[in-house]
Amino acid sequence: MSKQLKDLKVVFMGTPEFSVPILESLIELTDVVLVVSQPDKEVGRKRVLTPSPVKACAVSHGIEVFTPKKLREEYEYILNKKPDIIITAAYGQIVPKQMLIYPDYGCINVHGSLLPKYRGASPIQSAIMNGDEKTGITLMYMEEGLDTGNIIHAKEIDIAPTDTYGTLSEKLSILGRDLLVKTLPVIFEGENFDIPQNDDEATHTVKIKREDERLDFNKTAKELHNFVRALNPTPLANILVNGEEWKVLETEVGESTTDKPGTVVAVNKDSFEVACKDSTLVIKRIKPAGKKEMNVKDFFNGFNKDSLKGVILNEE
Protein backbone atom coordinates (compact mmCIF):
# COMPACT_ATOMS: atom_id res chain seq x y z
CA MET A 1 0.00 0.00 0.00
CA SER A 2 2.78 2.43 0.90
CA LYS A 3 4.40 1.80 -2.49
CA GLN A 4 1.14 2.77 -4.22
CA LEU A 5 0.78 5.89 -2.09
CA LYS A 6 4.37 6.81 -2.96
CA ASP A 7 3.27 6.87 -6.62
CA LEU A 8 0.49 9.39 -5.92
CA LYS A 9 1.31 12.52 -7.95
CA VAL A 10 0.80 15.52 -5.68
CA VAL A 11 0.84 19.24 -6.39
CA PHE A 12 1.30 21.09 -3.10
CA MET A 13 0.34 24.75 -2.72
CA GLY A 14 1.46 26.75 0.31
CA THR A 15 3.49 29.76 1.38
CA PRO A 16 4.29 30.45 5.09
CA GLU A 17 6.10 28.47 7.77
CA PHE A 18 2.75 26.90 8.73
CA SER A 19 2.79 24.93 5.47
CA VAL A 20 6.34 23.53 5.70
CA PRO A 21 5.78 20.49 7.99
CA ILE A 22 2.81 19.51 5.82
CA LEU A 23 4.95 19.67 2.66
CA GLU A 24 7.74 17.68 4.32
CA SER A 25 5.33 14.89 5.25
CA LEU A 26 4.01 14.76 1.67
CA ILE A 27 7.56 14.50 0.32
CA GLU A 28 8.06 11.43 2.52
CA LEU A 29 4.71 9.81 1.69
CA THR A 30 4.00 10.66 -1.95
CA ASP A 31 5.45 11.85 -5.25
CA VAL A 32 5.36 15.66 -5.03
CA VAL A 33 5.65 16.66 -8.70
CA LEU A 34 5.33 20.44 -8.18
CA VAL A 35 5.19 22.98 -5.37
CA VAL A 36 3.24 26.20 -5.94
CA SER A 37 3.98 29.21 -3.71
CA GLN A 38 3.65 32.98 -3.66
CA PRO A 39 6.35 34.99 -5.48
CA ASP A 40 9.53 36.03 -3.63
CA LYS A 41 9.07 39.15 -1.48
CA GLU A 42 11.35 42.00 -0.48
CA VAL A 43 12.18 41.62 3.22
CA GLY A 44 13.78 43.93 5.78
CA ARG A 45 15.17 47.44 5.50
CA LYS A 46 17.51 46.38 2.69
CA ARG A 47 14.55 44.96 0.74
CA VAL A 48 16.28 41.64 0.05
CA LEU A 49 14.27 39.46 -2.34
CA THR A 50 13.43 36.39 -0.25
CA PRO A 51 11.65 33.12 -1.12
CA SER A 52 8.71 31.91 0.95
CA PRO A 53 9.45 29.22 3.57
CA VAL A 54 7.63 26.69 1.38
CA LYS A 55 9.70 27.55 -1.68
CA ALA A 56 12.91 27.29 0.34
CA CYS A 57 11.85 23.87 1.63
CA ALA A 58 10.97 22.59 -1.85
CA VAL A 59 14.25 23.84 -3.34
CA SER A 60 16.21 22.11 -0.56
CA HIS A 61 14.53 18.84 -1.59
CA GLY A 62 15.17 19.40 -5.30
CA ILE A 63 11.47 19.83 -6.13
CA GLU A 64 10.32 22.19 -8.87
CA VAL A 65 8.64 25.37 -7.63
CA PHE A 66 6.12 27.52 -9.52
CA THR A 67 5.38 31.04 -8.22
CA PRO A 68 2.65 32.64 -10.37
CA LYS A 69 1.67 36.24 -9.67
CA LYS A 70 -1.86 35.53 -10.89
CA LEU A 71 -2.79 31.88 -10.53
CA ARG A 72 -6.03 32.27 -12.48
CA GLU A 73 -4.01 33.24 -15.57
CA GLU A 74 -1.24 30.63 -15.22
CA TYR A 75 -2.93 27.52 -13.80
CA GLU A 76 -2.50 25.42 -16.97
CA TYR A 77 1.18 24.94 -16.14
CA ILE A 78 0.08 23.12 -12.99
CA LEU A 79 -2.45 20.91 -14.77
CA ASN A 80 0.24 19.90 -17.28
CA LYS A 81 1.88 18.05 -14.36
CA LYS A 82 -1.21 15.78 -14.34
CA PRO A 83 -1.61 15.66 -10.54
CA ASP A 84 -3.70 12.91 -8.94
CA ILE A 85 -4.45 15.25 -6.05
CA ILE A 86 -3.85 18.92 -5.16
CA ILE A 87 -3.23 19.80 -1.51
CA THR A 88 -3.19 23.37 -0.25
CA ALA A 89 -2.22 24.89 3.10
CA ALA A 90 -2.21 28.69 3.51
CA TYR A 91 -1.33 29.30 -0.14
CA GLY A 92 -2.69 32.83 -0.45
CA GLN A 93 -4.57 32.93 -3.77
CA ILE A 94 -7.97 31.67 -4.90
CA VAL A 95 -7.70 28.33 -6.71
CA PRO A 96 -9.62 28.50 -10.02
CA LYS A 97 -12.44 26.08 -10.85
CA GLN A 98 -10.43 24.47 -13.66
CA MET A 99 -7.96 23.20 -11.05
CA LEU A 100 -10.61 22.14 -8.56
CA ILE A 101 -12.29 19.73 -10.97
CA TYR A 102 -9.12 18.22 -12.46
CA PRO A 103 -7.54 15.73 -10.00
CA ASP A 104 -9.03 12.24 -9.55
CA TYR A 105 -8.68 12.50 -5.77
CA GLY A 106 -9.84 16.11 -5.63
CA CYS A 107 -8.34 19.22 -4.05
CA ILE A 108 -7.83 19.15 -0.29
CA ASN A 109 -7.19 22.16 1.94
CA VAL A 110 -5.59 22.10 5.39
CA HIS A 111 -7.38 24.97 7.17
CA GLY A 112 -6.37 26.51 10.51
CA SER A 113 -9.75 26.52 12.25
CA LEU A 114 -12.71 24.28 13.05
CA LEU A 115 -14.86 25.01 10.03
CA PRO A 116 -17.37 26.49 9.43
CA LYS A 117 -15.95 28.88 12.05
CA TYR A 118 -13.36 31.33 10.73
CA ARG A 119 -13.52 30.81 7.00
CA GLY A 120 -11.08 33.01 5.10
CA ALA A 121 -7.57 34.42 5.31
CA SER A 122 -6.80 34.83 9.03
CA PRO A 123 -8.36 31.98 11.05
CA ILE A 124 -5.50 31.56 13.53
CA GLN A 125 -5.20 35.28 14.26
CA SER A 126 -8.98 35.61 14.60
CA ALA A 127 -9.23 32.84 17.21
CA ILE A 128 -6.61 34.59 19.38
CA MET A 129 -8.08 38.07 18.81
CA ASN A 130 -11.49 36.88 19.94
CA GLY A 131 -10.11 35.30 23.10
CA ASP A 132 -11.10 31.75 22.13
CA GLU A 133 -9.89 28.93 24.36
CA LYS A 134 -10.06 26.28 21.63
CA THR A 135 -9.48 26.05 17.89
CA GLY A 136 -8.33 23.31 15.55
CA ILE A 137 -7.53 22.02 12.09
CA THR A 138 -9.95 21.03 9.35
CA LEU A 139 -9.17 18.94 6.28
CA MET A 140 -11.72 19.76 3.60
CA TYR A 141 -12.47 19.23 -0.05
CA MET A 142 -12.17 22.50 -1.93
CA GLU A 143 -14.94 24.00 -4.04
CA GLU A 144 -15.52 27.42 -5.60
CA GLY A 145 -16.77 29.01 -2.37
CA LEU A 146 -14.15 30.21 0.12
CA ASP A 147 -13.61 27.40 2.65
CA THR A 148 -17.15 26.09 2.10
CA GLY A 149 -16.35 22.54 0.96
CA ASN A 150 -17.23 19.28 2.66
CA ILE A 151 -15.22 18.32 5.74
CA ILE A 152 -12.98 15.25 5.62
CA HIS A 153 -11.58 15.38 9.14
CA ALA A 154 -11.19 17.90 11.98
CA LYS A 155 -9.33 17.95 15.28
CA GLU A 156 -9.51 20.36 18.21
CA ILE A 157 -6.67 21.91 20.20
CA ASP A 158 -6.52 24.18 23.27
CA ILE A 159 -5.29 27.77 22.94
CA ALA A 160 -2.93 28.59 25.82
CA PRO A 161 -3.27 32.06 27.40
CA THR A 162 0.34 32.72 26.37
CA ASP A 163 -0.08 31.55 22.77
CA THR A 164 0.78 34.01 20.02
CA TYR A 165 0.04 33.71 16.32
CA GLY A 166 3.51 32.21 15.96
CA THR A 167 3.23 29.54 18.66
CA LEU A 168 -0.35 28.57 17.83
CA SER A 169 0.42 28.43 14.12
CA GLU A 170 3.28 26.04 14.87
CA LYS A 171 1.02 23.77 16.96
CA LEU A 172 -1.71 23.77 14.31
CA SER A 173 0.80 23.07 11.56
CA ILE A 174 1.97 19.90 13.33
CA LEU A 175 -1.64 18.92 14.03
CA GLY A 176 -2.51 19.46 10.36
CA ARG A 177 0.48 17.42 9.25
CA ASP A 178 -0.42 14.52 11.54
CA LEU A 179 -4.08 14.62 10.49
CA LEU A 180 -3.13 14.58 6.81
CA VAL A 181 -0.65 11.72 7.29
CA LYS A 182 -3.39 9.72 9.02
CA THR A 183 -6.12 10.57 6.51
CA LEU A 184 -4.37 10.55 3.13
CA PRO A 185 -3.92 6.75 2.89
CA VAL A 186 -7.62 6.28 3.63
CA ILE A 187 -8.60 8.78 0.93
CA PHE A 188 -6.23 6.96 -1.43
CA GLU A 189 -8.08 3.70 -0.73
CA GLY A 190 -11.31 5.35 -1.83
CA GLU A 191 -13.14 5.91 1.46
CA ASN A 192 -15.42 8.94 1.48
CA PHE A 193 -15.64 11.27 4.49
CA ASP A 194 -17.80 14.01 2.93
CA ILE A 195 -19.49 15.92 5.78
CA PRO A 196 -21.29 19.07 4.56
CA GLN A 197 -20.64 22.27 6.51
CA ASN A 198 -23.50 24.04 8.25
CA ASP A 199 -23.49 27.44 6.54
CA ASP A 200 -25.74 28.87 9.28
CA GLU A 201 -22.84 28.48 11.74
CA ALA A 202 -20.23 30.03 9.43
CA THR A 203 -18.11 33.01 10.50
CA HIS A 204 -15.67 34.81 8.24
CA THR A 205 -12.23 36.39 8.59
CA VAL A 206 -10.43 38.93 6.46
CA LYS A 207 -6.82 39.57 5.55
CA ILE A 208 -5.18 41.86 8.12
CA LYS A 209 -4.13 45.08 6.39
CA ARG A 210 -1.43 47.58 7.29
CA GLU A 211 -3.97 50.11 8.54
CA ASP A 212 -5.49 47.52 10.91
CA GLU A 213 -2.29 47.04 12.95
CA ARG A 214 -2.53 50.14 15.20
CA LEU A 215 -3.73 49.58 18.77
CA ASP A 216 -7.08 51.28 19.44
CA PHE A 217 -7.10 52.28 23.09
CA ASN A 218 -10.86 52.85 23.03
CA LYS A 219 -11.12 49.06 23.28
CA THR A 220 -10.67 47.05 26.47
CA ALA A 221 -7.20 46.09 27.66
CA LYS A 222 -8.08 42.41 27.25
CA GLU A 223 -9.06 42.98 23.62
CA LEU A 224 -5.78 44.78 22.95
CA HIS A 225 -3.72 42.15 24.78
CA ASN A 226 -5.29 39.48 22.55
CA PHE A 227 -4.70 41.67 19.49
CA VAL A 228 -0.98 41.95 20.30
CA ARG A 229 -0.77 38.15 20.66
CA ALA A 230 -2.60 37.65 17.37
CA LEU A 231 -0.16 39.83 15.41
CA ASN A 232 3.04 38.42 16.94
CA PRO A 233 5.51 37.64 15.31
CA THR A 234 4.08 39.18 12.15
CA PRO A 235 3.00 41.80 11.20
CA LEU A 236 3.10 43.09 14.84
CA ALA A 237 0.71 45.57 16.43
CA ASN A 238 1.95 49.15 16.67
CA ILE A 239 1.53 52.42 18.53
CA LEU A 240 2.52 55.99 17.68
CA VAL A 241 4.75 57.64 20.32
CA ASN A 242 5.39 61.34 19.66
CA GLY A 243 5.09 60.66 15.94
CA GLU A 244 7.32 57.55 15.96
CA GLU A 245 5.93 54.10 15.26
CA TRP A 246 6.80 51.46 17.84
CA LYS A 247 5.90 47.81 17.37
CA VAL A 248 4.40 46.05 20.40
CA LEU A 249 5.28 42.41 21.09
CA GLU A 250 4.30 41.61 24.66
CA THR A 251 1.65 42.97 27.00
CA GLU A 252 -0.55 42.10 29.96
CA VAL A 253 -3.77 43.48 31.38
CA GLY A 254 -3.27 45.98 34.20
CA GLU A 255 -5.45 47.75 36.77
CA SER A 256 -8.74 49.53 36.16
CA THR A 257 -8.52 53.20 35.19
CA THR A 258 -10.70 56.18 34.31
CA ASP A 259 -7.96 58.10 32.50
CA LYS A 260 -8.35 59.16 28.88
CA PRO A 261 -7.76 56.17 26.56
CA GLY A 262 -4.30 56.30 24.99
CA THR A 263 -2.66 58.14 27.90
CA VAL A 264 0.55 56.72 29.38
CA VAL A 265 -0.52 56.65 33.04
CA ALA A 266 2.43 54.84 34.61
CA VAL A 267 6.09 54.21 33.80
CA ASN A 268 7.64 51.28 35.66
CA LYS A 269 11.10 49.72 35.77
CA ASP A 270 10.27 47.16 33.07
CA SER A 271 7.06 48.41 31.44
CA PHE A 272 4.74 51.32 30.82
CA GLU A 273 0.97 51.38 31.20
CA VAL A 274 -1.54 52.89 28.81
CA ALA A 275 -5.15 53.69 29.65
CA CYS A 276 -7.73 51.73 27.68
CA LYS A 277 -11.53 51.64 27.78
CA ASP A 278 -11.64 49.86 31.14
CA SER A 279 -8.15 49.29 32.51
CA THR A 280 -4.51 49.72 31.57
CA LEU A 281 -2.49 47.80 29.02
CA VAL A 282 0.95 46.99 30.42
CA ILE A 283 3.48 47.09 27.56
CA LYS A 284 6.57 44.95 28.27
CA ARG A 285 8.33 44.31 24.96
CA ILE A 286 8.65 46.63 21.96
CA LYS A 287 10.47 47.31 18.73
CA PRO A 288 11.10 51.08 18.58
CA ALA A 289 11.43 52.77 15.18
CA GLY A 290 14.73 51.83 13.55
CA LYS A 291 15.77 49.49 16.37
CA LYS A 292 15.64 45.77 17.11
CA GLU A 293 12.98 44.30 19.37
CA MET A 294 13.79 44.48 23.09
CA ASN A 295 12.31 44.36 26.56
CA VAL A 296 11.07 47.75 27.76
CA LYS A 297 13.46 47.42 30.72
CA ASP A 298 16.44 47.34 28.33
CA PHE A 299 15.01 50.15 26.19
CA PHE A 300 14.78 52.40 29.25
CA ASN A 301 18.56 52.08 29.78
CA GLY A 302 19.12 54.56 26.95
CA PHE A 303 15.84 56.48 27.08
CA ASN A 304 14.45 59.12 29.43
CA LYS A 305 11.51 57.04 30.62
CA ASP A 306 10.01 59.92 32.63
CA SER A 307 9.35 61.72 29.34
CA LEU A 308 6.76 59.05 28.52
CA LYS A 309 4.50 59.81 31.49
CA GLY A 310 1.36 61.61 30.39
CA VAL A 311 2.04 61.20 26.66
CA ILE A 312 -1.07 60.50 24.61
CA LEU A 313 -0.31 57.74 22.12
CA ASN A 314 -1.38 57.54 18.48
CA GLU A 315 -1.57 61.31 18.00
CA GLU A 316 -0.19 62.33 14.61
Segments (PLM) and residue ranges:
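Donor/substrate-binding cores of folate-linked one-carbon enzymes
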Residues: 7, 28, 85-204, 211
